[in-house]
C-alpha cells in the first residue's frame, strides 16, 4: 500500500495532469465568452504584456543604461511568466476554436509539457498578486509617478498584472489548481532569494531594499517569512475563488451538457479525495 501511495503522489495525475488531458477543455473555454473571443482577449493581453516587457527593457537600456539587472527583479520575471502564459493559452484557445471546439494541440503533446502548462497557470495566478501587494505596500514612493514612463511602467507591471490575473481567475473555466502545486510553485519564489543576493554579490545592489540585512536587520527575516506565508494565503484564496466560480457557474447553467466548470472541479480536485487502493496481490 505504501508503494502504491508513493506512486500516486509522484504521478502526473497527482499534479492535475489527467489522462486524457483536460477532457472538458476547461483551459480553453470560458463561461462568459466563446472560445474565439476568449482566444482574442488572451492574445490581446499577450501582445500588451510582450510590448510592455520589450519597451521596459529597451528604455532602461537606452535611457538609463541599466538593463543588466533586468532579470534580477522578481517583477520582471513574474511578468515574463504572464507573457509566456498568455501567448501559450491564446494560441491553444484560438486553435481550439478553429478546430470546431473539438480539441487543442496541448491535449496530444507530451505529458511533461502538459504539466508545465498547468504549473505555469498556477504561478501566474499567484505571483503577480504578490508583486502588486509588496510593491504598493512597501516599495512605492514619490518617484512611482514622477514621469510618464515611470507611471505607465509601474501601473502596467504592478497593477495591470493583477488585473490580467483576475481575468483568468474569474472569467475562464481554468482551475482551481490542485493543492499539490503549492510546493512546486513555491520553489521559484524561494530560489529568487538566492538570485537577489547573487545580484548583490556580482553587481553591487539589492533588487529590493527590504532584502538588505545592513538596514533591515531583524525585519529581514520577518519580510521573508511574511512573503512565504502570504504566498500560501494567496494560493489558497485564488484556489477558493476558482472553486466558488466553478460551482456558481455550474449551478446556473441552463444546459446541463455545458457544465464544464463542474467537470473541472472533479478533474482538478480528484487528488484531494482519491486514495490509493490497497493492493490485493503481491505488491509490496
PLM segments and residue spans:
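Membrane-interface transmembrane-helix boundary segments in multi-pass integral membrane proteins
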Residues: 33-37, 203-239, 258-264
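C-terminal TM-helix exit segments that contain a strictly Trp-centered aromatic cap at the helix terminus
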Residues: 88, 92, 130-139, 191-203
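Transmembrane-helix exit/juxtamembrane "anchor" motif
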Residues: 90-98, 233-255
Amino acid at each position: 500500500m505504501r508503494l502504491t501511495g508513493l506512486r500516486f503522489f509522484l504521478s502526473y495525475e497527482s499534479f492535475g495532469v489527467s489522462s486524457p488531458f483536460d477532457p472538458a477543455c476547461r483551459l480553453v473555454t470560458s463561461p462568459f465568452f466563446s472560445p474565439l473571443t476568449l482566444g482574442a482577449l488572451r492574445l490581446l493581453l499577450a501582445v500588451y504584456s510582450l510590448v510592455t516587457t520589450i519597451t521596459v527593457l529597451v528604455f532602461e537600456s537606452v535611457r538609463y543604461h541599466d538593463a543588466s539587472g533586468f532579470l534580477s527583479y522578481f517583477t520582471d520575471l513574474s511578468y515574463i511568466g504572464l507573457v509566456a502564459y498568455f501567448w501559450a493559452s491564446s494560441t491553444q484557445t484560438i486553435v481550439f476554436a478553429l478546430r470546431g471546439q473539438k480539441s487543442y494541440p496541448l491535449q496530444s503533446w507530451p505529458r511533461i509539457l502538459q504539466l508545465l502548462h498547468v504549473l505555469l497557470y498556477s504561478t501566474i495566478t499567484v505571483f503577480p498578486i504578490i508583486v502588486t501587494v509588496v510593491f504598493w505596500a512597501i516599495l512605492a514612493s514619490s518617484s512611482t509617478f514622477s514621469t510618464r514612463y515611470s507611471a505607465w511602467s509601474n501601473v502596467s507591471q504592478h497593477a495591470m498584472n493583477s488585473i490580467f490575473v483576475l481575468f483568468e481567475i474569474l472569467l475562464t473555466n481554468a482551475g482551481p489548481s490542485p493543492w499539490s502545486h503549492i510546493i512546486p510553485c513555491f520553489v521559484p519564489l524561494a530560489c529568487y532569494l538566492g538570485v537577489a543576493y547573487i545580484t548583490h554579490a556580482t553587481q553591487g545592489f539589492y533588487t529590493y531594499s527590504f532584502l538588505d540585512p545592513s538596514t533591515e536587520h531583524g525585519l529581514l527575516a520577518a519580510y521573508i517569512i511574511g512573503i512565504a506565508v502570504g504566498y500560501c494565503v494567496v494560493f489558497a484564496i485564488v484556489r477558493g475563488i476558482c472553486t466558488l466560480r466553478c460551482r456558481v457557474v455550474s449551478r446556473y447553467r441552463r444546459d446541463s451538457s455545458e457544465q464544464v466548470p463542474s467537470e473541472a472541479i472533479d478533474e482538478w480536485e480528484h487528488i484531494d479525495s482519491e486514495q490509493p487502493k490497497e493492493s490485493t496481490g503481491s505488491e509490496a
